[in-house]
Protein backbone atom coordinates (compact mmCIF):
# COMPACT_ATOMS: atom_id res chain seq x y z
CA UNK A 1 0.00 0.00 0.00
CA UNK A 2 1.36 3.41 -0.95
CA UNK A 3 0.65 6.28 1.41
CA UNK A 4 2.56 9.20 -0.03
CA UNK A 5 1.86 11.88 2.59
CA UNK A 6 5.35 12.91 3.71
CA UNK A 7 4.28 16.45 4.67
CA UNK A 8 2.00 15.03 7.34
CA UNK A 9 5.01 14.03 9.40
CA UNK A 10 6.87 17.34 9.02
CA UNK A 11 6.16 20.59 10.84
CA UNK A 12 6.13 24.00 9.18
CA UNK A 13 9.92 24.21 9.55
CA UNK A 14 10.36 20.97 7.62
CA UNK A 15 11.38 19.03 10.72
CA UNK A 16 9.90 15.80 12.06
CA UNK A 17 6.64 16.22 13.95
CA UNK A 18 5.60 12.57 13.58
CA UNK A 19 7.60 9.56 12.40
CA UNK A 20 5.27 7.59 10.16
CA UNK A 21 7.30 6.42 7.18
CA UNK A 22 10.73 6.70 5.59
CA UNK A 23 9.14 7.64 2.29
CA UNK A 24 9.43 11.32 1.43
CA UNK A 25 12.11 12.13 3.99
CA UNK A 26 15.44 13.71 3.10
CA UNK A 27 18.87 12.30 3.83
CA UNK A 28 19.43 14.86 6.59
CA UNK A 29 16.34 13.60 8.44
CA UNK A 30 17.77 10.09 8.52
CA UNK A 31 21.33 11.08 9.38
CA UNK A 32 20.03 13.22 12.25
CA UNK A 33 18.33 10.15 13.74
CA UNK A 34 21.51 8.10 13.33
CA UNK A 35 23.71 10.81 14.83
CA UNK A 36 21.44 11.43 17.83
CA UNK A 37 21.21 7.68 18.45
CA UNK A 38 25.02 7.54 18.45
CA UNK A 39 25.13 10.27 21.09
CA UNK A 40 23.18 8.07 23.51
CA UNK A 41 25.77 5.27 23.37
CA UNK A 42 28.87 5.40 25.54
CA UNK A 43 31.80 5.08 23.10
CA UNK A 44 33.88 3.13 25.63
CA UNK A 45 31.42 0.79 27.34
CA UNK A 46 28.68 0.65 24.71
CA UNK A 47 26.08 1.35 27.40
CA UNK A 48 23.01 3.39 26.53
CA UNK A 49 22.59 6.52 28.63
CA UNK A 50 19.62 7.51 30.77
CA UNK A 51 18.81 11.17 30.13
CA UNK A 52 16.11 13.62 31.29
CA UNK A 53 15.10 14.65 27.75
CA UNK A 54 11.43 13.61 28.08
CA UNK A 55 10.96 14.18 31.80
CA UNK A 56 7.36 15.24 32.39
CA UNK A 57 6.18 13.85 29.04
CA UNK A 58 3.67 11.01 28.79
CA UNK A 59 4.10 8.37 26.09
CA UNK A 60 1.36 5.86 25.36
CA UNK A 61 2.19 2.63 23.55
CA UNK A 62 -0.87 1.58 21.56
CA UNK A 63 -0.11 -1.89 20.24
CA UNK A 64 -3.07 -3.41 18.41
CA UNK A 65 -0.81 -6.24 17.15
CA UNK A 66 1.31 -8.66 19.20
CA UNK A 67 4.91 -7.61 19.76
CA UNK A 68 7.84 -8.57 21.95
CA UNK A 69 11.02 -6.83 20.73
CA UNK A 70 9.41 -3.66 19.39
CA UNK A 71 7.18 -2.95 22.39
CA UNK A 72 9.91 -3.79 24.89
CA UNK A 73 12.60 -1.69 23.21
CA UNK A 74 10.20 1.25 22.88
CA UNK A 75 9.33 1.01 26.56
CA UNK A 76 12.99 0.82 27.58
CA UNK A 77 13.81 3.74 25.27
CA UNK A 78 11.01 5.85 26.75
CA UNK A 79 12.16 5.13 30.29
CA UNK A 80 15.79 5.91 29.36
CA UNK A 81 14.46 9.30 28.24
CA UNK A 82 12.76 9.69 31.67
CA UNK A 83 9.24 9.77 30.21
CA UNK A 84 6.11 8.51 31.94
CA UNK A 85 5.07 5.36 30.06
CA UNK A 86 1.62 3.83 29.61
CA UNK A 87 1.02 0.56 27.74
CA UNK A 88 -2.54 0.10 26.50
CA UNK A 89 -3.81 -3.43 27.06
CA UNK A 90 -5.79 -4.02 23.87
CA UNK A 91 -7.44 -7.18 25.20
CA UNK A 92 -9.14 -5.18 27.95
CA UNK A 93 -9.48 -1.86 26.11
CA UNK A 94 -12.75 -0.31 25.00
CA UNK A 95 -11.96 -1.07 21.36
CA UNK A 96 -12.83 -4.67 22.25
CA UNK A 97 -16.20 -3.39 23.47
CA UNK A 98 -17.11 -1.62 20.25
CA UNK A 99 -15.48 1.77 20.79
CA UNK A 100 -14.05 3.25 17.59
CA UNK A 101 -10.35 3.89 17.18
CA UNK A 102 -10.97 7.65 17.10
CA UNK A 103 -13.02 7.60 20.31
CA UNK A 104 -10.27 5.60 22.01
CA UNK A 105 -7.70 8.06 20.68
CA UNK A 106 -9.55 11.15 21.88
CA UNK A 107 -10.09 9.67 25.34
CA UNK A 108 -6.39 8.87 25.63
CA UNK A 109 -5.55 12.34 24.36
CA UNK A 110 -7.71 13.78 27.15
CA UNK A 111 -5.42 11.97 29.59
CA UNK A 112 -2.68 14.38 28.48
CA UNK A 113 -0.64 12.11 26.24
CA UNK A 114 2.28 13.72 24.42
CA UNK A 115 3.29 10.84 22.15
CA UNK A 116 1.39 7.86 20.77
CA UNK A 117 3.51 4.91 19.64
CA UNK A 118 1.20 2.89 17.40
CA UNK A 119 1.32 -0.63 16.00
CA UNK A 120 -1.71 -1.77 13.99
CA UNK A 121 -2.60 -4.50 11.50
CA UNK A 122 -4.14 -2.01 9.07
CA UNK A 123 -1.89 -0.20 6.59
CA UNK A 124 -2.26 3.53 7.12
CA UNK A 125 -3.41 3.35 10.74
CA UNK A 126 -0.57 5.56 11.99
CA UNK A 127 -1.29 8.13 9.28
CA UNK A 128 -4.99 8.09 10.18
CA UNK A 129 -4.20 8.74 13.83
CA UNK A 130 -1.68 11.47 12.99
CA UNK A 131 -4.34 13.30 10.97
CA UNK A 132 -6.68 13.45 13.96
CA UNK A 133 -4.46 14.15 16.96
CA UNK A 134 -4.24 17.54 18.63
CA UNK A 135 -1.39 19.82 17.49
CA UNK A 136 0.71 19.09 20.59
CA UNK A 137 0.53 15.29 20.18
CA UNK A 138 3.08 13.28 18.20
CA UNK A 139 2.70 9.86 16.55
CA UNK A 140 5.43 7.27 16.01
CA UNK A 141 4.64 4.35 13.72
CA UNK A 142 5.72 1.03 15.25
CA UNK A 143 4.46 -0.91 12.22
CA UNK A 144 1.23 -0.66 10.23
CA UNK A 145 0.01 -3.59 8.13
CA UNK A 146 2.21 -4.13 5.09
CA UNK A 147 2.97 -0.44 4.77
CA UNK A 148 5.88 0.68 6.95
CA UNK A 149 8.07 0.03 9.98
CA UNK A 150 10.34 3.09 9.99
CA UNK A 151 12.05 2.67 13.36
CA UNK A 152 13.05 -0.90 12.47
CA UNK A 153 14.56 0.34 9.22
CA UNK A 154 16.48 3.04 11.05
CA UNK A 155 17.91 0.68 13.67
CA UNK A 156 19.00 -1.54 10.77
CA UNK A 157 20.71 1.44 9.11
CA UNK A 158 22.36 2.27 12.43
CA UNK A 159 23.65 -1.29 12.80
CA UNK A 160 25.05 -1.23 9.27
CA UNK A 161 26.75 2.11 9.87
CA UNK A 162 28.31 0.88 13.13
CA UNK A 163 29.92 -2.03 11.31
CA UNK A 164 30.55 -0.63 7.84
CA UNK A 165 30.86 3.10 8.29
CA UNK A 166 29.13 5.06 5.56
CA UNK A 167 26.25 3.18 3.91
CA UNK A 168 27.21 4.81 0.63
CA UNK A 169 28.80 2.33 -1.80
CA UNK A 170 27.59 -0.80 0.03
CA UNK A 171 25.91 -3.74 -1.67
CA UNK A 172 22.98 -4.99 0.40
CA UNK A 173 20.99 -8.19 -0.17
CA UNK A 174 17.56 -8.78 1.37
CA UNK A 175 16.32 -12.38 1.38
CA UNK A 176 12.77 -13.56 1.96
CA UNK A 177 9.22 -12.29 1.79
CA UNK A 178 9.69 -8.90 0.17
CA UNK A 179 6.11 -8.59 -1.09
CA UNK A 180 4.39 -8.66 2.30
CA UNK A 181 7.04 -7.12 4.56
CA UNK A 182 6.60 -3.60 5.91
CA UNK A 183 10.15 -3.85 7.25
CA UNK A 184 11.63 -4.49 3.80
CA UNK A 185 9.69 -1.62 2.28
CA UNK A 186 11.09 0.78 4.85
CA UNK A 187 14.60 -0.72 4.58
CA UNK A 188 14.67 -0.22 0.82
CA UNK A 189 13.52 3.38 1.16
CA UNK A 190 16.17 4.11 3.80
CA UNK A 191 18.95 2.41 1.84
CA UNK A 192 17.98 4.41 -1.26
CA UNK A 193 17.96 7.73 0.59
CA UNK A 194 21.33 6.93 2.18
CA UNK A 195 22.67 6.05 -1.29
CA UNK A 196 23.59 2.41 -0.93
CA UNK A 197 25.41 1.33 -4.08
CA UNK A 198 23.12 -1.60 -4.84
CA UNK A 199 20.02 -3.11 -3.24
CA UNK A 200 19.25 -6.72 -4.10
CA UNK A 201 16.16 -8.72 -3.19
CA UNK A 202 16.28 -12.51 -3.27
CA UNK A 203 13.39 -14.94 -3.17
CA UNK A 204 10.71 -16.77 -5.15
CA UNK A 205 8.73 -14.73 -7.66
CA UNK A 206 5.56 -15.24 -5.62
CA UNK A 207 7.13 -13.23 -2.78
CA UNK A 208 8.58 -10.44 -4.91
CA UNK A 209 6.90 -7.07 -5.59
CA UNK A 210 5.05 -6.80 -8.88
CA UNK A 211 7.07 -3.76 -10.02
CA UNK A 212 10.54 -4.03 -8.44
CA UNK A 213 11.99 -1.45 -10.83
CA UNK A 214 9.87 1.19 -9.10
CA UNK A 215 11.69 0.38 -5.85
CA UNK A 216 15.12 0.64 -7.45
CA UNK A 217 16.12 -2.91 -6.55
CA UNK A 218 17.67 -5.82 -8.43
CA UNK A 219 15.73 -9.10 -8.19
CA UNK A 220 17.48 -12.47 -7.97
CA UNK A 221 15.81 -15.88 -8.18
CA UNK A 222 18.94 -17.77 -7.14
CA UNK A 223 20.40 -17.02 -3.72
CA UNK A 224 24.02 -17.80 -4.63
CA UNK A 225 23.97 -15.29 -7.47
CA UNK A 226 22.22 -12.69 -5.33
CA UNK A 227 24.74 -12.99 -2.50
CA UNK A 228 27.79 -12.71 -4.72
CA UNK A 229 30.06 -9.96 -3.35
CA UNK A 230 27.56 -8.30 -1.01
CA UNK A 231 28.54 -6.39 2.15
CA UNK A 232 25.31 -6.83 4.09
CA UNK A 233 22.76 -9.65 4.19
CA UNK A 234 19.32 -9.07 5.70
CA UNK A 235 17.05 -12.04 6.21
CA UNK A 236 13.33 -11.45 6.76
CA UNK A 237 10.74 -13.96 7.85
CA UNK A 238 7.86 -15.33 5.82
CA UNK A 239 4.77 -13.23 6.52
CA UNK A 240 2.37 -16.17 6.59
CA UNK A 241 -0.30 -14.17 8.41
CA UNK A 242 -0.43 -11.65 5.53
CA UNK A 243 -0.52 -14.16 2.66
CA UNK A 244 -3.99 -14.50 1.17
CA UNK A 245 -3.18 -17.85 -0.43
CA UNK A 246 -0.48 -20.52 -0.35
CA UNK A 247 2.48 -18.91 -2.13
CA UNK A 248 5.04 -21.57 -1.19
CA UNK A 249 5.02 -25.38 -1.31
CA UNK A 250 6.36 -25.51 2.27
CA UNK A 251 8.73 -23.82 4.71
CA UNK A 252 11.14 -26.73 4.21
CA UNK A 253 11.19 -26.09 0.48
CA UNK A 254 11.83 -22.40 1.09
CA UNK A 255 14.83 -23.23 3.28
CA UNK A 256 16.18 -25.64 0.68
CA UNK A 257 16.09 -22.91 -1.97
CA UNK A 258 16.61 -19.66 -0.03
CA UNK A 259 17.70 -20.46 3.52
CA UNK A 260 20.94 -18.77 4.53
CA UNK A 261 23.49 -21.49 5.29
CA UNK A 262 27.21 -21.27 5.98
CA UNK A 263 27.91 -22.51 2.45
CA UNK A 264 25.71 -19.84 0.87
CA UNK A 265 27.14 -17.15 3.15
CA UNK A 266 30.56 -17.85 1.60
CA UNK A 267 29.37 -16.21 -1.65
CA UNK A 268 29.22 -12.84 0.12
CA UNK A 269 32.28 -10.82 1.06
CA UNK A 270 34.34 -12.41 3.86
CA UNK A 271 33.49 -9.52 6.20
CA UNK A 272 29.79 -9.39 5.30
CA UNK A 273 27.41 -8.97 8.23
CA UNK A 274 24.21 -10.98 8.69
CA UNK A 275 21.08 -9.26 9.98
CA UNK A 276 17.50 -10.18 10.81
CA UNK A 277 14.73 -7.91 12.17
CA UNK A 278 13.13 -10.85 14.04
CA UNK A 279 11.44 -12.96 14.98
CA UNK A 280 14.00 -15.44 13.65
CA UNK A 281 12.66 -18.74 12.35
CA UNK A 282 15.65 -21.07 12.44
CA UNK A 283 15.61 -23.68 9.74
CA UNK A 284 13.22 -21.61 7.62
CA UNK A 285 15.03 -18.44 6.54
CA UNK A 286 18.36 -18.97 8.30
CA UNK A 287 20.44 -21.82 9.69
CA UNK A 288 21.34 -21.72 13.39
CA UNK A 289 25.04 -21.95 12.55
CA UNK A 290 24.75 -18.64 10.69
CA UNK A 291 22.36 -16.94 13.11
CA UNK A 292 24.76 -17.65 15.97
CA UNK A 293 27.95 -17.20 13.93
CA UNK A 294 30.60 -14.50 14.17
CA UNK A 295 29.18 -12.58 11.20
CA UNK A 296 25.73 -12.30 12.79
CA UNK A 297 24.79 -8.94 14.35
CA UNK A 298 21.18 -9.89 15.08
CA UNK A 299 21.34 -9.26 18.83
CA UNK A 300 23.15 -5.96 18.28
CA UNK A 301 20.18 -4.83 16.21
CA UNK A 302 17.95 -5.30 19.25
CA UNK A 303 20.27 -3.27 21.48
CA UNK A 304 20.71 -0.49 18.95
CA UNK A 305 16.93 -0.34 18.59
CA UNK A 306 16.77 1.25 22.04
CA UNK A 307 19.12 4.10 21.06
CA UNK A 308 17.42 4.68 17.71
CA UNK A 309 13.94 4.81 19.24
CA UNK A 310 15.27 7.18 21.91
CA UNK A 311 16.59 9.37 19.10
CA UNK A 312 13.29 9.45 17.20
CA UNK A 313 11.25 10.46 20.24
CA UNK A 314 13.74 13.03 21.52
CA UNK A 315 14.00 14.62 18.08
CA UNK A 316 10.25 15.08 17.60
CA UNK A 317 9.88 16.56 21.08
CA UNK A 318 12.90 18.86 20.62
CA UNK A 319 11.54 19.98 17.24
CA UNK A 320 8.23 20.90 18.86
CA UNK A 321 10.00 22.88 21.59
CA UNK A 322 12.08 24.74 18.99
CA UNK A 323 9.04 25.54 16.87
CA UNK A 324 7.14 26.91 19.86
CA UNK A 325 10.15 28.96 20.96
CA UNK A 326 10.56 30.43 17.47
CA UNK A 327 6.86 31.30 17.36
CA UNK A 328 7.13 33.10 20.69
CA UNK A 329 10.10 35.11 19.44
CA UNK A 330 8.25 36.01 16.23
CA UNK A 331 5.19 37.02 18.23
CA UNK A 332 7.26 39.20 20.55
CA UNK A 333 9.06 40.91 17.66
CA UNK A 334 5.75 41.55 15.90
CA UNK A 335 4.19 43.05 19.03
CA UNK A 336 7.20 45.28 19.62
CA UNK A 337 7.08 46.47 16.01
CA UNK A 338 3.44 47.43 16.40
CA UNK A 339 3.96 49.33 19.67
UniProtKB/Swiss-Prot annotation:
Listed EC numbers: 2.1.3.2
Oligomer status and interactors: Heterododecamer (2C3:3R2) of six catalytic PyrB chains organized as two trimers (C3), and six regulatory PyrI chains organized as three dimers (R2).
Positions contributing to L-aspartate binding: 97, 182, 237
Gene Ontology CC, one term: cytosol
Example of a GO biological process term: 'de novo' UMP biosynthetic process
Alphabetical list of Pfam families matching this protein: OTCace (PF00185), OTCace_N (PF02729)
Family of this protein: Belongs to the aspartate/ornithine carbamoyltransferase superfamily. ATCase family.
Pathway: Pyrimidine metabolism; UMP biosynthesis via de novo pathway; (S)-dihydroorotate from bicarbonate: step 2/3
Enzyme class name: transferase
Catalytic activity: carbamoyl phosphate + L-aspartate = N-carbamoyl-L-aspartate + phosphate + H(+)
InterPro entries: Asp/Orn_carbamoyltranf_P-bd (IPR006132), Asp/Orn_carbamoylTrfase (IPR006130), Asp/Orn_carbamoylTrfase_sf (IPR036901), Asp_carbamoyltransf (IPR002082), Asp_carbamoyltransf_Asp/Orn-bd (IPR006131)
Molecular functions per Gene Ontology: amino acid binding; aspartate carbamoyltransferase activity
Protein name, per record: Aspartate carbamoyltransferase catalytic subunit
Species assigned in the record: Hydrogenovibrio crunogenus (strain DSM 25203 / XCL-2) (Thiomicrospira crunogena)
Function: Catalyzes the condensation of carbamoyl phosphate and aspartate to form carbamoyl aspartate and inorganic phosphate, the committed step in the de novo pyrimidine nucleotide biosynthesis pathway.
Binding site for carbamoyl phosphate: 69-70, 119, 149, 152, 278-279
Keyword line: Pyrimidine biosynthesis, Transferase
